[in-house]
Amino acid sequence: MENIAHIFCNPEEEYWTIPPIKSFLKENDVKVDNVSAIKENTKTKLIDAAMDFAEQNEENKQIFIEWIDRTVKEGIKEIILHKCQMDEGMNLTFANEASTRKFLDMYVDTESTGYLINSKYDNKTRMVKYTLSKIRDKRAITLYFGKMITYIDKRKSKCRDIEFPVIFEYFIDEGWYLVRYKARSNLYEYHPEFQNEYMKTDYPVQDSKLVQEAVQQAMHILQLKEITGSEQSYFLKKMFYRILKQFTETPPEIKDRLDQYKNNIISMEQNIKELCRISEGQTFSLHSDLCNLFEKYISINWLDKEIFTRHRKAYPIKLRATDEEDSHVDQTAGGDSGPLQSKAIFFDNKRMIDNDEMCDGLTLKWKRSVRTYYPETFTVRISEKRGKCYLSFKEYTAEEDIQDVLFSIIGA
């Protein structure tokens, strides 16, 4: 198959991991015998089997290249989520599918195959394709951009030219855009006229610059304007706090135990007020502190830690926050030792976070909807920078699971 074995099929590029390849082979009844116990050999063998399937006939080829575009969109990804406004004049253009397609067709590269694979790439960022869809009943326009760059593997002293895809998605009615890409380093501008690899090192480029080039094109095409300013940062940190509260609600078992100690808390509160001569204005703070203290020690000594995860689709393992006095909190559960809510450090700073109702960022263990060949959970890091929401998926994550995270944020 022409040019089929390029970046998206290269085992070294990590666009695929073993689980999605196995899923593809299973869906298409492809059996692979004598799979090695060595991970690298297994992956190569599975990719070869997928490509053999694609080369059997045109129908298989079409199934394969459509699957590639889907898997490049999901997986190990960095995602930027940002609020934006569309020019009012574009409402009529995007009112129906026919007018939308007529408009977007003007911007698709003339040498594109209509897919990421086998399209022509050079040192210019080009729109390779677009799709119109409804994602969870929300209208979306997805633009696929690509550019050729040079990657230098400094450990092996080798360089190779690779495609750098950037996927831009705009939710028309919600006013959000998101950008997906695979984080990379050791990248250089593509100069095919240079035969000597040392000459190529004179033109380094950051992946963020490549992403920005695609975003600027997309914003121009769709006539979007970013919503900027400190209020956007404030808005996101409030959203993160609501997500944190959603996934750290006090479990019913612990609420029941706190109710049992209600009289003890009231008695201690009265004693402290008398001993320390606390004013009425500080009474509420004292009561909250005592409730937090009781909940802390009940939680960290509760034997069944699954009460903090059992009926939740996600739970935090790390969070960051800063209060109005610039006191900084950086909490972690310590590796994969359990949910942050079962740790003393969570309660040590809970009052500060609840007072401001803001969170700078958090890392969550998220339960997968798609579990065949995958572990039960994946990790996602959520943060804010200059009014934009950044999500980092460091392990292969299926599209359905990525959407779970995205719409939990958008809907917060």
Where are these regions (language model features)?
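Intrinsically disordered, low-complexity, charge-rich terminal extensions
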Residues: 1-412
